[in-house]
Design a protein with these regions (language model features):
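Surface-exposed amphipathic alpha-helices with a cationic face
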Residues: 31-34, 112-129, 133-134, 197-214, ...
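Conserved, mostly hydrophobic/aromatic
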Residues: 68, 130, 183, 203, ...
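Bacterial N-terminal signal peptides that target proteins for export
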Residues: 3-13
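Bacterial N-terminal signal peptides
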Residues: 13-22
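An active-site-proximal structural segment forming one wall of the substrate-binding cleft
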Residues: 148-181, 199-202, 206, 231-242
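Extracellular low-complexity, Gly/Ser/Thr-rich intrinsically disordered linkers
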Residues: 46, 356-442
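Substrate-binding surface in catalytic domains of secreted glycosidases
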Residues: 81-106, 189-355
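Glycan-recognition patch characteristic of GH18 chitinases/ENGases
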Residues: 30-168, 333-352, 356, 434
Length: 442
């Protein structure tokens, strides 16, 4: 027909390509909206809790994970810091660590590293990060290395060689084990503020350079604190720009050093909190991070799989906001009585695996709910669960399925990136609380 223009073959081809690209981009955008779920695994936990990488497979948790975060690798102290494996026996030498797949380990790589490689073969989507540092780590290595460009470059090169390239020991290689890093420097001081950002930038630059050779995408994240006194020395916007996401503590709002009982992981504050002036909440932390320039999609909210507890607490207000005398004692895991000998070197059988006064695993807490003199109470205003035993004067604060449901709804509503748990092995055998978090993120 006169005046009509018939599409040329090249135009058709281009149009088809654009359609395909459009579909691809939409698919990627849909993937981006899926919430991240991460979980920390303690290297030493196999000794105390008996929790192994194989348990991730047995409980069907592995299939739910975006990231498994292995805690911890060391940054050595001194003038020339380097990365090293904290516990070589647990990491790769112990042949008694249960196999994940049922197949024997390939010598000389045993232990947790051998088990993680088997887990990744069963779950190709799973990415594994090595967390460097930790609460008990010596921060002097971070400080020394971060002060100069040469020091930063040397430390990062050491960490990549050991963990990402997998040169874990002479004659022992663990290729394709770790997909990146979770930096857990607790915590930078005011003098470290710029150096911390520069160190993250060096990690990002060297990982990007490695990508040019391997064509693999490497993940960089850092663990960031809940309380202002700890995050005030981090340039949150600049630091967040260097990483894929932040694991931001959703706990530590109350702890062993407190003089009055409080909630350790509250979502909100409340006007009737008599400790309001010295308290904080997850909501306040989220708002502070976002106001500082951290993208909501990079914010991963932390969930504790443990309880914080005290004793010598008077029978007032369910034990909440009361003066305390001491940390709660270590109990047997079934909650029936005290652990006779909670020494970590040679504990009595059947004790709560944390073996630490002032703490209990969620697994043990479940055995106390409305049992053995304990009465459960839920703070709907602040969104937190508590247990109190009036006769013993013992009080615990923790997360339960109700608080998890509200917190995960908050994550969805505020378009946060997702969530993570500290730490695997503290949930019950079925991973009930962990699975509740996963379900709530959907």
């Amino acid at each position: 027909m006169t005046g009509s223009v018939r599409p040329r073959p090249i135009q058709v081809a281009l149009l088809s390509l654009l359609v395909l690209l459009g579909c691809y981009c939409r698919s990627e955008a849909q993937d981006d909206h899926r919430k991240i779920f991460g979980a920390y695994f303690e290297e030493w936990g196999t000794r105390y809790s008996g929790y192994n990488i194989a348990d991730l497979e047995k409980s069907n948790i592995a299939d739910q994970l975006t990231y498994l975060i292995y805690a911890f690798g060391n940054v050595t102290p001194g003038a020339t810091p380097a990365c090293e494996i904290a516990d070589p026996v647990a990491a790769f030498r112990d042949p008694s660590v249960p196999s994940v797949s049922g197949k024997p380990y390939v010598s000389p790589l045993y232990g947790n590293f051998g088990a993680i490689l088997q887990l990744k073969q069963l779950h190709p989507h799973l990415k594994v990060l090595i967390s460097l540092g930790g609460q008990l780590g010596d921060a002097s290595g971070w400080v020394a290395a971060s002060q100069t460009s040469a020091g930063r470059a040397a430390l990062v090169a050491s960490c990549i060689n050991t963990f990402v390239k997998g040169n874990v020991a002479p004659g022992v290689q663990a290729r394709n084990l770790f997909d990146g890093f979770n930096i857990d420097w607790e915590f930078p001081s005011a003098a470290d503020k710029e150096n911390f950002t520069a160190l993250l930038g060096e990690f990002r630059a060297q990982l990007n350079e490695l990508t040019k050779t391997t064509h693999n995408k490497y993940i960089l994240s850092f663990d960031s604190p809940a309380l202002r006194k700890d995050y005030v020395n981090i340039d949150l916007k600049a630091a967040a720009a260097q990483v894929d996401f932040l694991t931001i503590d959703g706990y530590d709002y109350a702890g062993p050093s407190d003089k009055e009982t409080n909630e350790a992981s509250p979502l909100y504050e409340a006007d009737n909190n008599p400790l309001r002036a010295e308290s904080s909440s997850i909501d306040e932390t989220v708002k502070a991070y976002l106001a500082a320039g951290v993208p909501a999609g990079k914010y991963l909210m932390g969930f504790p799989l443990y309880a914080v507890g005290w004793t010598g607490v008077p029978n007032v207000n369910h034990g909440l906001y009361q003066h305390l005398k001491d940390l709660s004692p270590v109990l047997l895991a079934d909650g029936s009585s005290l652990c006779p000998h909670p020494d970590k070197a040679s504990p009595s059988p059947g004790c709560d695996p944390l073996l630490a006064a002032g703490f209990l695993t969620y697994s043990t807490i479940e055995n106390l709910i409305n049992k053995n003199g304990f009465v459960a109470w839920f703070d709907a205003a602040r969104v937190g669960a508590t247990l109190y035993n009036p006769a013993a004067g013992t009080f615990y604060t923790f997360d339960n399925p109700t608080s998890v449901a509200t917190k995960t709804a908050y994550i969805r509503k505020n378009k946060l990136g997702g969530a993570y748990v500290w730490v695997l092995g503290q949930d019950d055998a079925n991973g009930s609380l962990t699975k509740a978090i996963v379900a709530g993120l959907q």
